[in-house]
Amino acid sequence: MKDVKRIDYFSYEELTILGGSKLPLVNFELFDPSNFEEAKAALIEKELVTENDKLTDAGFKVATLVREYISAIVNIRINDMYFAPFSYEKDEYILLSRFKNNGFQIRIINKDIAWWSIVQSYPLLMRQEKSNDWDFKQIDDETLENLNNESIDTIGRVLEIEIYNHQGDPQQSLYNIYEQNDLLFIRYPLKDKVLNVHIGVINTFIRELFGFDTDENHINKAEE
């Protein structure tokens, strides 16, 4: 992705200032950025915060979205797209988009737009189903070891889905979806479990996350 420098893009520090807290599911390889003085100056320049640390009207609107994302009952990450239900409107979601320079953009979108944005961003979801793809096929230990020992060049398109549910006891789930040797796999890192699947299962799972009607939750069934 190209670098972005428009005023409707924000650094991680700017968003944490506006939200008053860290952003769920937004992680960094080494440590969280912490240049808050520069972030505050940027917010003042964008006329979102005053010199006296007060939110302007425009700043209040952006801060409301950030705080909605932080306080949502569930956060969903699909690679560099972060979602949370918008509590004020049914079927609306907050979308936090992350760019390669760790710039972010935040907005509200309908769940239909959310789905098509995901599909357009990650062509893996338009994969043509293969005759050797399964609904769910457990990979035995020997096959898994052979796959793990193969060159990284055998791995094609990759998608990560991460879910953080705040209801009751907080629960966090991570799924790695990837192509290898012309097959599609889903890996549950926390359970060290790998399944051969077809893309329809993955698409159904994602659509269920956004409240689309489906027959059953395939991914949850596979984890049982």
Curated annotation (Swiss-Prot):
Interacts with EssD. Interacts with EssG. Interacts with EssC. It is found in: Secreted. The gene is essE. GO terms for cellular component: extracellular region. This is Type VII secretion system protein EsaE. Component of the type VII secretion system (Ess). Plays a role in Esx protein secretion. Plays an essential role in the processing and secretion of EssD. The keyword Secreted applies. Keywords: Secreted, Virulence.
